[in-house]
Amino acid sequence: MNIDIIISADDIKEEKIKDKSIVVIDILRATSVIITALNNGCKEVVPVVEIEEALEKVKNNRKNYILGGERKALKIEGFDCSNSPLEYKSELVKGKTLVITTSNGTRAIKEALLAKDILIGALINGKAVAEKLISLKNDVVIINAGTYGEFSIDDFICSGYIIDCIAKDMEVKLSDISKVAKYLYNMNTNMEFIKEAKHFKRIMELGLFMDLEYCCKKDIVSIVPQYKNGIIK
C-alpha cells in the first residue's frame, strides 16, 4: 500500500487523488462533528461549501433537517448548531439529515470527488479508519483540510496516527511527507503537540475547552462514514 498526504484543501489535485482511497481529516472540528452526529443516530450528512446552498437544501422540509457549521470557528446565524461535536446529541440528530458547511472540512470533502473511496476520519475513529483502509486494498491519500489553505499540525498528527495503525498491520510505502507525519505522531503519542496548532489556540481562545478535549481523544467511535453521491453515511 502506498500512502501519501495532501496538507490542505487548496492543494488537492486530480492526479493525486484519482482512483485512490481518500480519507478527509479535519479534527478541529468538521470531521469530528460528522462522525459524532452519525454515531448518535443522524440519518445522513450532506456537506456543502456555501451557506446559501445549505439554506436552499432545507427550505422546503425544515423539520427533517439540522443545519450545522461555522465561519471563522463561530456558529452561523440562523443555524441550529455550531461546529461543536458536543452539540450533536442523539435527541437532536436522531433520524434527521444534517446539512453542514464549514470553512475547511466540507470544502476538502467536495474537492475529493475523483477518488475511488472517500472516508471521513479523525482521531476519534482513527483506528477504525485504518482498518477500513486495509480492507479496501488500495493506495491511500490522506487529505488534511488544513486551516484556510495553510498546514495544520492537528490534522497532520492525526494522519500520522492513522498511518501508524496501518503500518502495524501491513507493509506500507510512505511518501516523504507521510514518513514525517508518522514520525511526528510517534514523538507525540500523548497529543500534547497538537496544543501548538494555530487552530487549536483559536478554539481555546473561544473557551471551547471541552470540544478540544473531545476531538483529541483516540478511538472512542468505531464507525467510518463514507461520502457517496453527495451524502455521507
Swiss-Prot record:
Question: Which reactions is this enzyme annotated as catalysing?
Answer: (2R)-O-phospho-3-sulfolactate + H2O = (2R)-3-sulfolactate + phosphate
- Enzyme Commission number(s) of this protein: 3.1.3.71
The UniProt GO MF terms for this protein read: 2-phosphosulfolactate phosphatase activity; magnesium ion binding; sulfopyruvate decarboxylase activity
Keywords, A to Z, come to:
Hydrolase, Magnesium
Instruction: Report the Pfam families cross-referenced here.
Output: 2-ph_phosp (PF04029)
The protein's matches in InterPro entries, at most eight in alphabetical order, are given as:
ComB-like, ComB-like_sf
Task: Give the SUPFAM superfamilies listed for this entry.
Answer: ComB-like
Q: Which PANTHER family match?
A: 2-PHOSPHOSULFOLACTATE PHOSPHATASE-RELATED
Q: Which family does it belong to?
A: Belongs to the ComB family.
- Report the protein name in the record: Probable 2-phosphosulfolactate phosphatase
The organism named in the record is Clostridium tetani (strain Massachusetts / E88)
The gene designation is comB
